[in-house]
Each structure stands twice: as structure tokens, then as C-alpha cells.
Amino acid sequence: MNEENLLWGKELKQIFTALLVVGLFSGSAYAMGPTKKYEACMKQTGNVLSEIDACMSKEYKAQKKRLKKVFKPYLAKAPAEEQGLVKQSHQQWLAQRDQICNNKPIVKNEKTELQRISCLMQMTQTRADMYEARTGRISK
């Protein structure tokens, strides 16, 4: 095995460990954290990068939908005079997430795409978790 594959194996292990930790601390009694479909999908990937990417892409779409859903009660809970600021803050966060996760790699390949989608998925999930925790509402 060459050095690049060994390094990528370590990076992949770190990604999976981070996802596991997020899942453990998000509380499975709530709808917070990764979806059950995502967890099942990841178990079936056999560590094949294209399959991992497909699972993460589906989960990112699910977390984006969840973020939109949980933002509404979060916004409604804010005092009327602060709702404009809450919307602005949310838009700034979306732009920051996209800037962080969509940075242009020197070399674009399957590994960098996996890192990009993992970043988008994790940041979106974490923000949706925060909105849920602050409103006390649980998305279904």
C-alpha cells in the first residue's frame, strides 16, 4: 500500500469517528443527529468511496430539508423586533458554511469530493441540532 492510501485511510477513519461521536452525543431519543437511513446506508458501503459519497449526499439533502423545517419554529420563537437579525444571521451562516466546505482543492478527486460533502452534511446537521435544542422542538 502506498503512503497516499495509508494517509487517506487515516482521514477516512477520522471522518467516521467524528460522525460516530456526533451521533452518540446527539441523543437517539430525538430526531437530532444523523438519520437512521444514513446509518444503515453507511453500514452497507464496504468502505467503497463512491458508495460512501452516495450515502453522505443523501444525508446532506435530508439535513438541508431538516434545517429548513427546524429554522421556522426557531425564528418564530425570537422576539418580533429580532427576527430580521435572526434571518440575517442564518443567511450569513449558510454563506460561511458554503465558503468553508466548498473551497477549491488544488486537485479535485473522489477524496476531496467526499471531504466536501462530509463538511456540508456535518455543519448542516449541527446547525439543525442547535435550532432544535434551542426551541425544544423535535423534527420528525
Task: Show where each model-derived region lies.
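Intrinsically disordered, low-complexity regions enriched in Ser/Pro/Gly/Gln/His and often acidic
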Residues: M1-N2, V86
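Positively charged n-region of N-terminal signal peptides that target proteins for export
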Residues: N2-E4, G9-I15
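Low-complexity, intrinsically disordered regions enriched in charged/polar residues
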Residues: L6, A18-L19, M32
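Intrinsically disordered, low-complexity regions
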Residues: G9, V21, G46-L49
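N-terminal alpha-helical modules
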Residues: Y30-K140
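Hydrophobic alpha-helical context, especially transmembrane and signal-peptide helices
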Residues: Q14-A18, S118
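Bacterial N-terminal signal peptides
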Residues: A18-S26
